[in-house]
C-alpha cells in the first residue's frame, strides 16, 4: 500500500445529500476538491441541481451554487471511482421488544454496499453518520480490501451548519493512525477549529457522549419542571438563579426532545450495555414529556369548562428557526390530543412538511380555544400588540400554554389571555 499512501486525495465521493452531506460536499468542492455528490433519490438530485432543495440553512444555497458553478461538484444517483468516500446517511433508531431502541444501520450498510464496486486498494472511507461503538471496525471488515477507514462524526447545529462546519473542533477516529491522518488532510482544508485524532471506537463514543450529556441535562430540567408544577415554584426563575453558580449549567425544560441527534443517540449506548440505566431513564423521561404537556392542556381546558375544545399548536419543527420536523415533540403532543378526540390545527412559519396538515396563522386560530406553543421560533417571540389583538378576535377562548417560555406574557395578558407556563406552579 506504500504507493497509495503517497497518493494525494483529489476526488471525493459524498454519499447522502441531506442536512450534513450536502453542506459537506459543497464545502469540499469550494475548497478545491473534485466532488461527486450522491443521493439515491433522483427527485432530490434534480432539486439540488435546480437549487430548489428543502433545507432552510443560511448560506447553503450560495455555497452550493458556487460549488456547481466551479464545476467541482457534480450530483448523481450513483457513486463512481474516487480517492475517498464520505458517508453521510441517516441512522434512525428502531424499536425493540423491551421498549428500548437501537440503531438502524441499514442506510449505512446500503451506502457501503453501493460503493464497494468503486473502491480500490488504498482508498479512504469516512463515516460521518452517528453510529454505535465498534461499527467503523465492522465496516472495515465488510469492505474486505486494503483500504483506510475512519469515523468523523458531524457536530453541527441546524441553522448554523455552515458556520459550525468551519469553526467547530472535529474528532477523527481511524481503524489505524494512518486512516485518521488521511481523513484529517481532507477536513483541515476547511475546518478552522482543532482536529483531534483518536481511534474509531473512541470517536464513536465521544459523539454519543456529547448528545447523551445534553439529553440527560434536559431530562433533569424537565423533572425539575414537573416538581415545580407540583410544589408551586416557577422553574424558569429557579433555573436562572441556580445557573448563577459558577459550576451549574441547567438547560431549559420543554415539551420533549426531538431532532435526529439528541433524541436518538443515547439509545446507541443503551443497546451496547446493561450499565446504561441512568441514560435510559433520562431518555424515557424526555420521551414522556409530550404526554405530560397533553395532560396540562386537557386540565386547563377542563378548568375553563370548555366542551368540545379546539386546540391550535404553534410549532411543528423540533426546534426553533429550522424546518426540520424529525422526531418533533409536536407530533407526539398532537397524537396524544387526537387520542382524546381533540381537534388540532397547526401553524409553523418554517416547516415545509409535517405528518399533520399545516395551516396559515389565520386559519389555525379560527374558533380555537387554546394556543399551545411547542417551538421557540423567533416569529412567536416577536408578536406585536396589534398582531395579538387580531389573533384575539379570531379565538373562541383566550388560553395559552407556553411550553418554551418565549412569549411576551405581559402583552398577551393585557389582551385578555390566560397563560399557563410549563413548570410554573407559582401562577
From Swiss-Prot:
UniProt-listed GO biological process terms: polysaccharide biosynthetic process
MF GO annotations: NAD binding; oxidoreductase activity, acting on the CH-CH group of donors, NAD or NADP as acceptor; UDP-N-acetyl-D-mannosamine dehydrogenase activity
Active site: 207, 261
Keyword set, alphabetical order: NAD, Oxidoreductase
UniProt-annotated binding residues for NAD(+): 19-20, 39, 44, 91, 130, 326
Reaction catalyzed: UDP-N-acetyl-alpha-D-mannosamine + 2 NAD(+) + H2O = UDP-N-acetyl-alpha-D-mannosaminouronate + 2 NADH + 3 H(+)
Keyword field contains Oxidoreductase: yes
Alphabetized InterPro entries for the sequence: 6-PGluconate_DH-like_C_sf, NAD(P)-bd_dom_sf, UDP-Glc/GDP-Man, UDP-Glc/GDP-Man_DH_C, UDP-Glc/GDP-Man_DH_C_sf, UDP-Glc/GDP-Man_DH_dimer, UDP-Glc/GDP-Man_DH_N, UDP_ManNAc/GlcNAc_DH
UniProt KW Disulfide bond keyword: no
SMART domains: UDPG_MGDP_dh_C
Gene3D superfamilies: NAD(P)-binding Rossmann-like Domain
Residues that coordinate or bind UDP-N-acetyl-alpha-D-mannosaminouronate: 155-156, 207, 211, 214, 245, 247, 258, 318-319, 404
Family membership noted in the UniProt record: Belongs to the UDP-glucose/GDP-mannose dehydrogenase family.
Function: Catalyzes the four-electron oxidation of UDP-N-acetyl-D-mannosamine (UDP-ManNAc), reducing NAD(+) and releasing UDP-N-acetylmannosaminuronic acid (UDP-ManNAcA).
Oligomeric form and interacting partners: Homotetramer; probably dimer of dimers.
Protein name (record): UDP-N-acetyl-D-mannosamine dehydrogenase
Gene: wecC
Amino acid at each position: 500500500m506504500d504507493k497509495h499512501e503517497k497518493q494525494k486525495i483529489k476526488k471525493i465521493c459524498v454519499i447522502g445529500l441531506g442536512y450534513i452531506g450536502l453542506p459537506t460536499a459543497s464545502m469540499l468542492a469550494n475548497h478545491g476538491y473534485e466532488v461527486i455528490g450522491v443521493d439515491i433519490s433522483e427527485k432530490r438530485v434534480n432539486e439540488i441541481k435546480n437549487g430548489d432543495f428543502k433545507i432552510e440553512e443560511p448560506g447553503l444555497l450560495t455555497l452550493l451554487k458556487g460549488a456547481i458553478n466551479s464545476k467541482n461538484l457534480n450530483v448523481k444517483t450513483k457513486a463512481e471511482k474516487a480517492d475517498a468516500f464520505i458517508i453521510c446517511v441517516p441512522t434512525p433508531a428502531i424499536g425493540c421488544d423491551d421498549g428500548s431502541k437501537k440503531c438502524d444501520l441499514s442506510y449505512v450498510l446500503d451506502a457501503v454496499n453501493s460503493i464497494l464496486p468503486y473502491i480500490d486498494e488504498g482508498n479512504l472511507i469516512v463515516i460521518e453518520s452517528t453510529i454505535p461503538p465498534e461499527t467503523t471496525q465492522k465496516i472495515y471488515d465488510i469492505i474486505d480490501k486494503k483500504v483506510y477507514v475512519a469515523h468523523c462524526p458531524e457536530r453541527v447545529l441546524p441553522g448554523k451548519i455552515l458556520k459550525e462546519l468551519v469553526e467547530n473542533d472535529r474528532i477523527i477516529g481511524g481503524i489505524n493512525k494512518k486512516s485518521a491522518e488521511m481523513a484529517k488532510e481532507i477536513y483541515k482544508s476547511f475546518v478552522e477549529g482543532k482536529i483531534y485524532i483518536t481511534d474509531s471506537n473512541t470517536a464513536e463514543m465521544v459523539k454519543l457522549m456529547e448528545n447523551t450529556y445534553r439529553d440527560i441535562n434536559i431530562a433533569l430540567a424537565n423533572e425539575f419542571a414537573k416538581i415545580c408544577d407540583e410544589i408551586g415554584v416557577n422553574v424558569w426563575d429557579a433555573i436562572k438563579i441556580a445557573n448563577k453558580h459558577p459550576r451549574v449549567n441547567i438547560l431549559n425544560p420543554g415539551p420533549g426532545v426531538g431532532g435526529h441527534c439528541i433524541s436518538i443517540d443515547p439509545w446507541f449506548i443503551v443497546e451496547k450495555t446493561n450499565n446504561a440505566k441512568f441514560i435510559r431513564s433520562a431518555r424515557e423521561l424526555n420521551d414522556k414529556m409530550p404526554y405530560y404537556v397533553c395532560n396540562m392542556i386537557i386540565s386547563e381546558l377542563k378548568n375553563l369548562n370548555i366542551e368540545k375544545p379546539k386546540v391550535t399548536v404553534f410549532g411543528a419543527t423540533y426546534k426553533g428557526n429550522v424546518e426540520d420536523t424529525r422526531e418533533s415533540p409536536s407530533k407526539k403532543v398532537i397524537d396524544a390530543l387526537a387520542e382524546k378526540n381533540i381537534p388540532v390545527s397547526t401553524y409553523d412559519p418554517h416547516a415545509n412538511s409535517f405528518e399533520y396538515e399545516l395551516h396559515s396563522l389565520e386559519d389555525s386560530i379560527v374558533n380555537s380555544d387554546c394556543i399551545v406553543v411547542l417551538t421557540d421560533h423567533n416569529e412567536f417571540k416577536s408578536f406585536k400588540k396589534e398582531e395579538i389583538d387580531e389573533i384575539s378576535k379570531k379565538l373562541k377562548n383566550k388560553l395559552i400554554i407556553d411550553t418554551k417560555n418565549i412569549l411576551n406574557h405581559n402583552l398577551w395578558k393585557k389582551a385578555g389571555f390566560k397563560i399557563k407556563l410549563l413548570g410554573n406552579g407559582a401562577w
